[in-house]
């Protein structure tokens, strides 16, 4: 007998059996339920919920401690990250250590570590207060920002976590340590998309693309957003794809309350997000609901979230153990995990390809990453350094990495590259009650192909100080790039006795100094 699947052997009254048949019948009566017991399958459903979704780690910890096996996992958003890490062979303790690390905290804010910054390609400081990038054909519609943080760190971390695991298992999610599904949202067709194969890092990234927080990505040409928009608790996916004997659900999310006349956020939320069903779609299941008091982006409260999930699971563990008869020891699951991870081919990149501007290759990106003529092999350290160097290129707006396994057991890194908009406008200045008010405006044109180039014009203007600068820069791509820049600068200082602002003209001026210079520079980095 297994819960949810009752195996029965029926003997009608008066049935006569010979000794051999009696023996066979007795064995069947003994072994039939045990056979069902050994086949009992348990599925775990993990909801979305932002930072509160890290409570799922506590759920995994409690289940493993009590020997409850997990045969399938489905997840949305934060649940897809936690679930994918478990299915990729990470233990609950390793997942917990990762989300508590400084790297994870930086990743959630869009910042880089000091060692990842490439100062050579960072713009010089100026008087800009804000900037906007635009193209001449779409000045208004495509100039508004679509993200709150830069995802370069996040995307590369997902590649390191999942890229080799996915490629080493033929990008088949059924071949992972635990079979896995995650969901993302296709906003064009207003439907939920279930990932059962493909690039695992890409599937998790799509499932976690919170609108206006992260850059959306395309999967097979379709723009993807957070799975929680249309299905924030994929219990239906678990039931339809795996049909386990028992479903455990961990939910830290909820449906938005009805909109009100004076609450813009509630109106937008109800327009964008569909209500999800947070119940188990069958009788054979148990719903765990950790306390949800953590904000969507409060990733600094990781420890509290994990503890909440652990305590909520322990509170229901007796009921779970009553229905789930199968057990697995810590030693057994550790051995299985080590065997699975031992089959993963280490990350060594021997070739670089990229998709840019409707499948056209961008030579600049390729030449900046690898020495092709020398048959260079990149380990994780070299790959990481060059990835962030390329990402720092002002002419590139977005870059997403994917791994393909080659026949020689090395990897090809494929970069989905998106060019920055042609023009960038910077506006700012210094505003004071004294007579040193200064405005600033700058305009840059950017181009990229076999080389990267930019034309820049800027001006400071005010009563005391005025300046005009024109410059042109050309960069030749290589592992250690070389750039050539020409510049022309005019400065003017007007030393006067006045507390005027921009427009008052005081005569006579006591001293006016003018300066003009130009030059040519060759730049070459010796490190980051």
Label each region the model flagged.
Residues 380-381, 386, 392, 398-528:
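Gram-negative/organellar outer-membrane beta-barrel architecture
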């Amino acid at each position: 007998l297994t819960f949810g699947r009752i195996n029965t052997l029926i003997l009608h009254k008066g049935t006569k059996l010979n000794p051999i048949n009696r023996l066979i019948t007795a064995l069947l009566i003994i072994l039939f339920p045990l056979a069902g017991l050994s086949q009992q399958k348990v599925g775990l459903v993990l909801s979305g919920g932002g930072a509160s979704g890290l409570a799922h780690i506590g759920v995994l910890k409690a289940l493993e401690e009590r020997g409850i096996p997990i045969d399938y996992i489905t997840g949305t958003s934060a649940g897809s990250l936690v679930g994918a890490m478990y299915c990729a062979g990470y233990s609950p303790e390793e997942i917990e250590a990762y989300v508590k690390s400084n790297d994870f905290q930086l990743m959630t804010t869009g910042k880089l570590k000091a060692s990842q910054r490439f100062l050579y390609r960072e713009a010089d400081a100026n008087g800009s207060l804000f900037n906007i990038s635009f193209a001449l054909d779409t000045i208004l519609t495509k100039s508004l920002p679509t993200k709150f943080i830069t995802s370069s760190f996040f995307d590369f971390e997902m590649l390191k976590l999942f890229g080799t695991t996915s490629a080493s298992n033929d990008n088949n999610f059924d071949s992972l340590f635990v079979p896995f599904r995650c969901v993302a949202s296709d906003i064009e067709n207003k439907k939920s998309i279930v990932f059962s194969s493909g690039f695992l890092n890409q599937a998790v990234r799509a499932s976690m693309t919170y609108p206006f927080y992260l850059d959306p990505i395309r999967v097979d040409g379709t723009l993807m957003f957070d799975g929680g928009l249309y299905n924030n608790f994929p219990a239906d996916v678990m039931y339809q794809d795996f049909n386990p004997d028992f479903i455990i659900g961990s939910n830290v999310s909820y449906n938005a309350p009805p909109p009100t006349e004076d609450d813009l956020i509630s109106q937008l939320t109800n327009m964008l997000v569909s209500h999800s069903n947070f119940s188990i779609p069958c009788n054979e299941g148990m719903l765990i609901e950790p306390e949800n008091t953590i904000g969507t982006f409060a990733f600094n409260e990781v420890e509290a979230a994990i503890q909440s999930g652990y305590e909520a699971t322990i509170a229901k563990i007796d009921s779970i153990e009553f229905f789930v008869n199968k057990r697995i020891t810590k030693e057994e699951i550790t051995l299985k995990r080590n065997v699975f991870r031992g089959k993963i081919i280490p990350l060594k990149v021997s070739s670089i390809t990229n998709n840019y501007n409707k499948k056209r290759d961008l030579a600049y990106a390729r030449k900046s990453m690898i020495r092709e003529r020398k048959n260079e092999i990149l380990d994780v350290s070299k790959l990481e350094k060059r990835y962030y160097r390329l990402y720092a290129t002002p002419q590139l707006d977005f870059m997403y990495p994917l791994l393909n396994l080659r026949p020689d057991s090395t990897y090809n890194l494929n970069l989905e590259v998106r060019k920055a908009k042609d023009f960038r406008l910077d506006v700012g200045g210094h505003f004071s009650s004294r007579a040193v008010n200064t405005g600033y405006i700058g305009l840059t044109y950017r181009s990229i192909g076999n080389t990267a180039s930019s034309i820049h014009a800027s001006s400071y203007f005010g009563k005391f100080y005025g300046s005009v600068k024109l410059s042109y820069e050309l960069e030749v791509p290589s592992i250690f790039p070389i750039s050539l820049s020409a510049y022309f600068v005019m400065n003017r200082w007007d030393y006067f006795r006045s507390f005027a602002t921009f427009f008052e003209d005081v005569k006579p001026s006591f001293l006016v100094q003018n300066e003009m210079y130009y030059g040519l520079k060759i730049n070459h980095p010796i490190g980051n």
